[in-house]
């Protein structure tokens, strides 16, 4: 399996977000200023006892009325329960045990997931007030007592969480297996596509959004290449519930993206590119994943000459950060063009793993600089000394220059275009790191 997922669950204002932010620390950073690249502080990767896991913050609900609070809390907890391997159930020592705490406890017991009870806002962790022991009445077993504000007791809490991780935590670096995440909003046809690819109904399909409850791995071999398809459940927006809940609709897709080598970003041809599609695609881009934009239900679109190319143009306009991704028009229901998917997956996976020698790279840089002069500012011009590739998946390059402040985004984009023109890299993002050094004599 991949990284374990730990969700922090509890009623509003018990300190979930404070706890999350304490653990996240400086590891949360704003990435590219690009539409669709999520900035929500909703989850982060934590490492404890040499094991990485994903921590989900289910906080941030604004209480409007008692009824709405209950709806939001229940929906939030449901999603966290479905997603998580281990749940931290947080309560507030200062408020004491409430009716809402009891309802959450009942819900968690029914889940049969491992739950660690965490009593927050205790200033003297080693000598807690007697009142905290009333939380034993929740029937959740032993409690961990912490102060998120002061960082007290958190190590013991994480030790307890660690004990509940599945035993089969292991690297997924299997030999020559391409892991494919099929992601998209509910009812875009993710399960239908996998069924069409496999030629059999391995995944229950229904036109009711959210039918697929959890991520399902399907292993298949085609022409000597092994693939693992990860089908992710979609969670439908509920109009009567606060828009804060919408953030959780892509949690499963995010965890699938993290595990994947290639992402198939499913878009409903009739709906076009929606805001939710943009967020999911943006996350795949942010994570450096090779991606294919799959326009499903193409058989339902009324077509004229040029319809396909015009649609492709609109897709790349709306997903402007992902113009490198090929767009495939299919019908999972009829099987139209589905046969092309294996070939395209293998192609973009190879592109993401492609390496270029430093010599070839610097020949390209010399030619690029000769064609378009680097930018200058106040009489000082950018000088590129050399470039070398430092990684794959995604292809990553370090560029050594005289002044990183002169390396404008527009010139970086120009170099990226030259790389793509000469070496391909279709379907994969490219990363640049700028390094400044003095010119050698």
From Swiss-Prot:
Q: Which GO terms describe its biological process?
A: ribosome biogenesis
InterPro entries the UniProt entry points to: G_ENGA (IPR031166), GTP-bd (IPR006073), GTPase_Der (IPR016484), KH_dom-like (IPR032859), KH_dom-like_a/b (IPR015946), P-loop_NTPase (IPR027417), Small_GTP-bd (IPR005225)
Q: Per the database record, which ranges form the KH-like domain?
A: 354-438
> Entry's SUPFAM superfamilies?
P-loop containing nucleoside triphosphate hydrolases
Q: Does the keyword Electron transport apply?
A: no
Work out whether the entry's keyword set contains Repeat. Answer: yes
A GO molecular-function descriptor = ribosome binding
Pfam families linked to this entry: KH_dom-like, MMR_HSR1
Residues in EngA-type G domain copies: 4-169, 178-353
Where GTP 1 binds, per the record, is at: 10-17, 57-61, 120-123
Listed binding positions for GTP 2 are 184-191, 231-235, 296-299
Which keywords, in A-to-Z order, does the entry hold?
GTP-binding, Nucleotide-binding, Repeat, Ribosome biogenesis
What the protein does? GTPase that plays an essential role in the late steps of ribosome biogenesis.
Family to which this protein belongs:
Belongs to the TRAFAC class TrmE-Era-EngA-EngB-Septin-like GTPase superfamily. EngA (Der) GTPase family.
Subunit-level organization = Associates with the 50S ribosomal subunit.
Its recorded name reads GTPase Der
Q: What's the gene? A: der
């Amino acid at each position: 399996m991949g990284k374990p997922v730990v969700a922090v669950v509890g009623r509003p204002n018990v300190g979930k977000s404070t706890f999350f932010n304490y653990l996240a620390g400086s590891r949360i950073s704003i990435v590219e200023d690009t539409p669709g690249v999520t900035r929500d502080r909703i989850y982060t990767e934590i490492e404890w006892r040499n094991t990485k896991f994903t921590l989900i913050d289910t906080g941030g609900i604004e209480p409007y009325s008692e009824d709405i609070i209950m709806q939001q809390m229940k929906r939030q907890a449901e999603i966290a329960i479905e997603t998580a391997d281990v749940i931290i159930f947080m309560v507030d020592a200062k408020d004491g045990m409430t009716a809402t705490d009891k309802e959450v406890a009942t819900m968690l017991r029914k889940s049969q997931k491992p739950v660690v009870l965490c009593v927050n806002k205790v200033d003297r962790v080693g000598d807690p007030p007697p009142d905290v022991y009333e939380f034993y009445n929740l029937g959740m077993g032993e409690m961990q007592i912490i102060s998120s504000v002061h960082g007290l007791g958190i190590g013991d809490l994480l030790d307890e969480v660690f004990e509940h991780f599945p035993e089969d935590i292991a690297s997924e670096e299997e030999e020559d297996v391409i892991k494919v995440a099929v992601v998209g909003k509910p009812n875009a046809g993710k399960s239908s596509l996998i069924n069409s690819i496999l030629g059999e109904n391995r995944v229950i399909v229904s036109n009711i959004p959210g039918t697929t409850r959890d991520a399902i791995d399907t292993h298949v071999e085609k022409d000597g290449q092994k693939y693992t398809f990860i089908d992710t459940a979609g969670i439908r927006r509920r109009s009567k519930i606060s828009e804060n809940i919408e953030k959780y609709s892509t949690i499963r897709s995010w965890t699938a993206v993290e595990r994947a080598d290639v992402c198939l970003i499913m878009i409903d041809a009739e709906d076009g590119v929606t805001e939710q599609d943009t967020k999911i695609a943006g996350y795949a881009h942010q994570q450096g994943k090779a991606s294919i934009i799959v326009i499903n239900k193409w058989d339902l679109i009324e077509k004229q000459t040029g319809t396909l190319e015009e649609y492709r143009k609109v897709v790349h306009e709306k997903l402007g950060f992902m113009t490198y991704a090929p767009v495939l028009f299919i019908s999972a229901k009829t099987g139209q063009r589905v046969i092309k998917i294996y070939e395209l997956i293998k192609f973009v996976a190879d592109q993401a793993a492609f390496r270029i020698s430093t010599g070839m790279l610097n020949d390209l840089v010399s030619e690029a600089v000769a064609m378009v002069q680097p930018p200058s500012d106040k009489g000082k011009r950018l000088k590129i000394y050399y470039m070398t590739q430092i990684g794959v998946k995604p292809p990553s390059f370090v560029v050594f220059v005289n002044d990183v402040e002169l390396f404008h985004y527009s010139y970086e984009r120009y170099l990226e275009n030259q790389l793509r023109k000469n070496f391909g890299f279709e379907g994969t993002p490219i990363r640049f790191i700028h390094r400044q050094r003095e010119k050698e004599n």
